[in-house]
Amino acid sequence: MTKQPEDWLDDVPGDDIEDEDDEIIWVSKSEIKRDAEELKRLGAEIVDLGKNALYKIPLDADLRPAIELAQRIKMEGRRRQLQLIGKMLRQRDVEPIRQALDKLKNRHNQQVVLFHKLENLRDRLIDQGDDAIAEVLNLWPDADRQQLRTLIRNAKKEKEGNKPPKSARQIFQYLRELAENEG
């Protein structure tokens, strides 16, 4: 006859007094596997980062070399190294690592949003001309009106002549410089 979990608790001698702090939390095997798989995905996400972004993540002395090694390894060895990184992450507090990753992703998302706004502004500058230039000057008073007009005029000529949009790219770069100098 095999004992069930309830029977195990009854056989403990001197356990007549119940203590609320000694409560046992049962965790299913599949939940443990899900947590391990999630940490392995977190490790893979860290491994996929570039070197500059990797140094912004708080990693200890054992984990950083394992991640740098995984970045150099290919194929099957990489999979095994990712499993090792997942195992190492299970023994650590991963919350600071997750927060740093979220911060990096958020910064990237903010840049994407800014680039979309600048692209829309560039398109309005090419289509509307002086009205959009006034908007740019309201946003960035130190913008050079003459340079913008020249770039817009050249961009319109390139667009009409079906030439590569060199001036449109220059407008975007100029707007990006203005936005970066502001912030």
Curated annotation (Swiss-Prot):
Q: Where is the signal peptide?
A: none
Gene Ontology biological-process annotations? assembly of large subunit precursor of preribosome
Which SUPFAM superfamilies does this UniProt record tie to the protein? PSPTO4464-like
Give the main location: cytoplasm
Q: Please give the Pfam families that the UniProt record associates with this protein.
A: DarP (PF04751)
Family matches, as Gene3D superfamilies:
PSPTO4464-like domains
The record's InterPro entries line, in alphabetical order, gives: DarP, DarP_sf
Q: Which GO terms describe its molecular function?
A: ribosome binding; rRNA binding
Localization annotation: Cytoplasm
Q: Name one GO cellular component term.
A: cytosol
Report the function annotation for this chain: Member of a network of 50S ribosomal subunit biogenesis factors which assembles along the 30S-50S interface, preventing incorrect 23S rRNA structures from forming. Promotes peptidyl transferase center (PTC) maturation.
Q: Which family does the record claim for this protein?
A: Belongs to the DarP family.
Protein name as it appears in the record: Dual-action ribosomal maturation protein DarP
Origin species:
Shigella flexneri
**Gene (UniProt):** darP
